[in-house]
């Protein structure tokens, strides 16, 4: 095992999470693949290759919520063309492309509605006991393993939408249940594509409970890596112990990341989080963690590119100090150097603390949602700024606004060689201040 870098440095997300343009009036997840998005993806691959993040893991290459019934004509010729361009571009840069894959849930809504016997009552999860359910899961895996798509592996998720709770399935603990379907799926993939990387992300599945370790160990024997979303194992001091007990690499989602808001203009927010993420990744490395699924960011927002670059640098060079990763990212995004870079680095650190010191969000708890992922009042329009409304008191928001105004005034006086990055940063700060004012 390479001890100079994370073994599985994966950047991931839904197809449009890195898009420079929002889809304001589409329900989440929108997987529209146009030429502008393809250009954004190629740009992202360039930065990914520059920083040595080997794997790109995409959800939504083929579907949004459900595989079709009957299982045919999954994508049209134009989408297949874009997929080939994307896969070829990744391979030309020495990168590998993974597919985000639901196991028994996520991707099977239409199957459950139309195919008798795959579910025992759940509208979102198929039943472990059903032969018809396995037949559909196997079809999906066989489809993905077809070499024509240019994929290099999968990351499996089985728990973020719950599980079957029929009398037979409910006799199993959550970990037992998910282990059964994950191991069966991974073994099928390993037999069909021994060259593939197989990951597993524990959205909705706890990995920190001592009684469940035996089940995690079974999973670890058939996958290459697994990641814990909320870092409970670190919070209770068990992560190092868990790492030592597994046969695969173990990791996280990088401590903190801003969940890219599908419906929002890319300059509507300014929430740097790179130091929090870099420090969390350094702690993961110290605990023996060697895997991370580090989420896509839209580089149209300079603060997001800086944050992503910082975590990516830790993944490829874990002994890098977070502050050094920040300076390197600022040089790349803003074109600053020397004393100007030091000044901007201090400014960015204060900008990050300005939000997180007043917010009830805790690093290690996964994603920070700016808008509701699915706004129940209207899922196809931009949602309210819940990262401000629900995570800060009115007094905290007022203090935050005053500090942002002071930071903006400082930034306006700084010499920034990249004029476009400067303009976009000021616009993003302005967007945040408008949000705060709307909540007053």
List each model region and its residues:
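Substrate-binding groove of N-acetylhexosamine-processing glycoside hydrolases
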Residues: 1-4, 9-10, 27, 37, ...
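Feature activates predominantly on carbohydrate-active enzymes
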Residues: 1-138, 142, 146-151, 190, ...
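Glycine-rich, histidine-containing beta strand-loop boundary motifs that form or position
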Residues: 57-60, 99-103, 157-158, 200-202, ...
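Short, internal active-site loops enriched in acidic
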Residues: 63, 104-105, 159-163, 203-208
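Short acidic, glycine/serine/threonine-rich loops at helix termini
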Residues: 68-69, 109-115, 119, 166-169, ...
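Active-site cleft segment of glycoside hydrolase catalytic domains centered on the general acid/base Glu
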Residues: 114, 120-131, 158-192
């Amino acid at each position: 095992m390479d001890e100079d870098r994370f073994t599985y440095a994966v950047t991931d997300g839904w197809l449009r999470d890195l898009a420079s343009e929002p889809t304001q009036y589409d329900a989440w997840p929108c997987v529209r693949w146009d030429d502008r998005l393809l250009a954004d993806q190629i740009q992202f691959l360039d930065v990914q290759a520059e920083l040595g993040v080997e794997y790109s893991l995409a959800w939504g290459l083929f579907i949004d919520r459900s595989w079709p019934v009957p299982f045919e004509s999954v994508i049209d010729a134009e989408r297949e063309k874009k997929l080939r361009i994307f896969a070829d571009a990744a391979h030309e840069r020495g990168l590998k492309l993974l597919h985000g894959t639901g196991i028994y849930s996520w991707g099977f809504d239409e199957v459950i509605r139309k195919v008798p016997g795959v579910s025992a009552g759940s509208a979102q999860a198929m039943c472990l006991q059903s032969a018809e359910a396995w037949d559909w899961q196997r079809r999906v895996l066989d489809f993905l393993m077809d070499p024509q798509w240019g994929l290099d592996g999968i990351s499996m998720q089985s728990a973020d939408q719950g599980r079957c709770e029929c009398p037979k399935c409910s006799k199993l603990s959550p970990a037992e249940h998910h282990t059964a379907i994950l191991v069966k799926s991974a073994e099928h993939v390993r037999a069909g594509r021994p060259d593939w990387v197989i990951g597993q992300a524990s959205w909705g599945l706890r990995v920190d409970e001592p009684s469940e370790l035996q089940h995690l160990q079974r999973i670890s024997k058939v996958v290459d890596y697994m990641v814990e979303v909320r870092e409970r194992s670190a919070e209770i001091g068990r992560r190092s112990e868990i790492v030592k007990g597994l046969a695969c690499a173990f990791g996280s989602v990088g401590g903190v990341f801003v969940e890219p808001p599908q419906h929002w203009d890319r300059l509507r927010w300014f929430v740097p989080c790179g130091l929090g993420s870099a420090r969390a990744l350094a702690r993961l490395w110290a605990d023996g963690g060697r895997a991370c699924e580090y989420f896509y960011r839209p580089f149209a927002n300079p603060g997001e590119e800086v944050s992503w670059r910082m975590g990516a640098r830790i993944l490829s060079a874990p002994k890098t100090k977070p502050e050094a990763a920040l300076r390197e990212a600022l040089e790349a995004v803003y074109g600053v150097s020397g004393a100007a870079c030091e000044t901007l680095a201090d400014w960015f650190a204060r900008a990050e603390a300005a939000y997180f010191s007043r917010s009830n969000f805790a690093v290690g708890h996964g994603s920070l949602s700016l808008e509701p992922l699915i706004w129940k009042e209207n899922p196809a329009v931009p949602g309210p700024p819940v990262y401000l409304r629900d995570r800060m008191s009115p007094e905290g928001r007022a203090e935050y606004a005053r500090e942002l105004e002071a930071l903006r005034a400082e930034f306006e006086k700084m010499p920034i060689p990249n004029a476009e990055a400067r303009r976009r940063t000021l616009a993003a700060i302005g967007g945040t201040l408008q949000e705060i004012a709307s909540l007053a």
